[in-house]
Amino acid sequence: MDVQAEDLFRDVESDAFVNESHGGTGFQQNFSAWPGAFQVAWPLTNHQDLASETQDNGNKSGGDEIDVSLCDSQQQGRSRTSSLVNGLLTELYDTYRGGAGCYYFRQQDSVDSSTEASGSDAFLSRSNPESGFLQELSERQSSRHQMLYLKQKDCSELKAIKDELNRRIAIQSAKLLRQVKQKDRLQHKVQKNCDIVTACLQAVSQKRRVDTKLKFTLEPSLGQNGFQQWYDALKAVARLPTGIPKEWRKRVWLTLADHYLHSISIDWDKTMRFTFNDRSNPDDDSMGIQIVKDLHRTGCSSYCGQEAEQDRVVLKRVLLAYARWNKTIGYCQGFNILAALILEVMEGNEGDALKVMIYLIDKVLPDSYFANNLRALSVDMAVFRDLVRMKLPELSQHLDVLQRTANKESGGGYEPPLTNVFTMQWFLTLFATCLPNHTVLKIWDSVFFEGSEILLRVSLAIWAKLGEQIECCQNSDDFYSTMGRLTQEMLEDSLIDSNELMQTVYSMAQFPFPQLAELREKYTYNITPFPAPVKSASFSGRTSKMRDSDEENEIDEDDVNANAVGCLGPFSGFLAPELQKYQKQIKDQKEEQSLKASNIAELSPGAIDSCRSEYHAVFNSMMMERMTTDINALKQQYSRIKKRQLQQINQVYIAADKGPVSCILPSQVNNSPVINHLLLGKKLKQVNRSKNALHLPASKSSLLANEETKAKQNSPWRTHIRVHRKNIARAKGELGHGDTIGLIDEQNEVPKDQPDTSKETEETAQPPCSSAGEETSLDRTVMKVDGRSPEPVYQDENANVTVVQSKLEALELSPDAETEVSLEMSQTFQESQSDSHSSSSESESFKKSPKVQVFSPFPSVKPLKKSATARNLGLYGPNSRTPSVNFPHMSKTFNKAANGTTGSKKR
C-alpha cells in the first residue's frame, strides 16, 4: 500500500479556503435577510483584483462540487491554488491599506476568509463609533455596570451597536458554517482512506472468516465490539512491512493504555494526584537515589549531557510515579531506558508516559518479569534456549560445544549458557539498547498487540542472522569478541534491516507460538530464579562433576515433592514436616561440601545440583517406607468416613418425620449386603476355627464386658440406636410382624430399681454356644452389652471379609432355621409378658382388639398429632370422605429375610 501524503495535504490546504458566499446562494442573500442590517456595497465592477477574485472563486466553487464527487482534475487544482493566493493578497491589502477610499473598505469584511487578518481581532481594532462602544461595553465586567452603560446611550447609538453586533455574528456564523462543511469533507476523505487500508489488509490476509470482518479505523468506534474491531485492524497493520506510521503511534499506544485502565476501573485523576505527589511519599528517598544513579546511564541521547537536565527531572518523576503505583515491583534497573523511550513517543507528557508504562509492565509482559527475583525473566531465558534447540539446532549444538569446552578449561569453574549474557539484556530493555530507535519502535508496536511472545521471536531472528558468523568461533573467547563487534553493528543499523526482521518474526511460526505455553508452564515450576539478596559468603560452588544447564531434562526436587505428597491425598499434611526437615538436612550437606563463594543458581537459571540422583534415591526410599506405614491409618480413616455417612443418612431419615408414612425403611428395600470395595478381588481366608479357638476365662470376659460397657454407655449415638431399635420392634409388634431385636432390648434393659442386673449383663457377655459345625474363634468375638444387639469385634485384617461372609450366610436360611426363629420369638415374647405387667396388659389388649396404628420407624420425643386436614386428605387411611387406598405393607419374603437376620445375630 502506497498512499501519497503530499496529495492528501494539498487537498486539505486547498479545502481550507473554499469560498461559499460568492455563488448564487451565497452569504450576500442571507445577510440581507437580517432586520435592520446596514447596506453593504459589494465592489464587483470597480476593483480589478476583486473581480478576478470573484471569477476565480466561482471556478473554485465549481471545483468544490467536483471535489465532493471525487473527480478533481489537474487544471481545477491549479485554479484553486491561484484563487488562494489572490484571495490572501486582496484581503491583506483591502484591510490595512490607507489613502482615499480606505474608509469604504474598512467598513466591510471578507465574510468567507479564514485568515487571521480578517478575524475578530482585525475588525475589533477598526475605528468606527460602534466598535468603540462595544470596546467600552466589554470593559464593564459585571452585567450591572453594562446595564448602566447602555442606559446612558440614546436610541440611535443603541441601534448602531445592535447593527454592529449583527454584522459580527453573521461573519462568525458564516465562518462556523464553512468549518463544519470542511469537517464533513475531511471526514469523508478519511473514511475513503480507511476503506482503502481495509481493502489492503484483507488482500494480504490469510483469507480466513475472521479476516473478512476487518475494518480499519483510526479510533475505536462506539459500540460493543468497537474496540475489538479497531484492535484487530491495528494488529494487522502492525504486521505490514512498514508497520504502524509514526504519526499514529502516540494515539495508538494511548488508546490501548486507556482501555486497560478503564477495564480495571481506575480513577486516573486520583491516581495522578497520588503518584506525582512527592509530599505523600516521603519514603522514596532511597529509591530516588538509585534512580538518579541510573539516569546518567540512560542510552537515549535526549537524556544525556548538561542540556538534558530538565528532561531527566521529568524521567525521574515518571519512574517514581510508577514505583508508587506498583509497590510490589517498585523500581528495577532498566526502567529508565523503557521510560525514556515512552516519554519520547509521548512527547514529554508525564501522565501519558505513566499510562503506557503501566500497560506495558502490568498487562503486556508476564507477571514478576521485573520482580526482585526476576522469575519470569529467568523462565523466558530457559524457554528461549529450548526454542533455539528446536529452530536452530546447529547453532545450539555449536554453542553447547563451546560451553562444555570452557567448563573443562576453567578447571572447576562454571561457564553459563553463552546466550544468557546477551539475551538477558535484550529482554530487560526490550531491545532498546541493541537496535536502532525506529526498529525498536516497530518491535514495541508488535509487543503491544501480540504480547511478550514477540521478544522470543525477535531474539530467534537475531540469533539466526548472527549464526553464520558465530559458527566460525573456536572457543568462548572468540564468541564474546565476535558478539561485541556484531552488537555494535546492530546498533548502527548496518547489519539488520527492520522490515526484513519483522517479516521473519511474523513468518517464523503461527500465533501463538507452538508449545510456548507448555514450556513456560514447565519452567515456571522447574526453575531456580535469581535470588533477591545475593549472599556471597554462605553459598559457594562445587568441584564435583556438574552438568550443563542446557542439557537438563530431569524433574526438579519441588516437582518430586509435590507429586509424592499430592498422591497421598489427606495424609499429605503428615509428611510436610518430615519433608521440610529432610530438605533442610540436604541443604546443610550441600553447604558443607561447598568450596567456592559462587552459586550456579546466581549465574544462570536452571542450574543443576551435583547430588540430585542421590537425593532422589533417598527420597524415594523414605516415601515408600512412609506409605507402607500409613496403610493402617488409611483404613481407620475410611472406617470413620463410612460411619459419618451412615450418621448423615440416619439424620436425613429422622428429619423426614413429617413426610409420607411408610412401613418399609429405605435401607430395607435392597437386601443386598454392603461390600467394602477396597477388598474386592481379595480371596477369602480359610480359617480353621477349631484350631484357632481361644477360650477366655469367665472373669476375663466379664472384665472385658465391663470395660466395653463403661466405654460405650455414655455414647449419644449408641443411645440413639437403642431408642431407634425399640421403636422399630414395637411398631412391628403392633403390625403383627415379630422382631427379636426390640424384645431382647426390652428384656435386657437395665431399670433403675434393679441393682442385680449387672450379673445378667456379665452372663450375656459370655459367647453363646453355637451349633455343632461352628466354634468360637479368635477372629470373631460376639459381645452383647447393655441391652444392645450382638455386634462382632474384629481383631484380624480380614475382618471386613468375615463380615461379608457372615451376612451372606444370614441371607440363605433353611426352613428349619425359620421355624426355630419363630419358636424362639414366641418364647421370648411370653417371657417378656410374665416379667412386666404393663407389657402384658398391652399385649392382651392387642390380642383382643388389634388396632393398627400409624407406623413411624423414626424415634420421636412427642407422639404424632393427627390433624383434621391430613385425615380428610386420607393421609391416615381411608375414611368416609376418601376412597379406600391400599397402603404398602411388608411382604413375606421381607419378613423372612428380616427374621433370618435377627436369628443369625442371636446365634
Curated annotation (Swiss-Prot):
Where's the Rab-GAP TBC domain?
243-451
Instruction: Spell out the Low complexity composition-biased ranges.
Output: 831-843
> Which spans does this entry mark as compositional bias, Basic and acidic residues?
749-762
Where composition is biased (Polar residues), the residues are 892-907
Does Coiled coil appear among the keywords?
Answer: yes
Query: Which InterPro entries did the record assign?
Result: Rab-GAP-TBC_dom (IPR000195), Rab-GAP_TBC_sf (IPR035969), Tbc1d30_C (IPR032738)
Coiled coil, from the record: 583-645
Instruction: Tell me which UniProt keywords the record has, alphabetically.
Output: Coiled coil
- Work out whether the entry's keyword set contains Coiled coil: yes
Instruction: Give the region (Disordered) as residue ranges.
Output: 51-74, 731-781, 812-859, 872-907
Q: Which Pfam families match?
A: DUF4682 (PF15733), RabGAP-TBC (PF00566)
Q: What does this protein do?
A: May act as a GTPase-activating protein for Rab family protein(s).
This protein is called TBC1 domain family member 30
| Protein species of origin | Xenopus tropicalis (Western clawed frog)
